[in-house]
From Swiss-Prot:
Modified residues (Glycine amide): G8
Localization annotation: Secreted
Position of the signal peptide: none
GO CC term (a single one): extracellular region
Protein function: This cephalomyotropic peptide stimulates contractile activity of cockroach protodeum (hindgut).
UniProt keyword list: Amidation, Neuropeptide, Secreted
GO biological processes: neuropeptide signaling pathway
Native organism: Rhyparobia maderae (Madeira cockroach)
Protein name (Swiss-Prot/TrEMBL): Leucokinin-7
C-alpha cells in the first residue's frame, strides 16, 4: 500500500 509500502 502507498501509505504502508512495507505491507505493499
Amino acid at each position: 500500500d502507498p501509505a504502508f509500502s512495507s505491507w505493499g
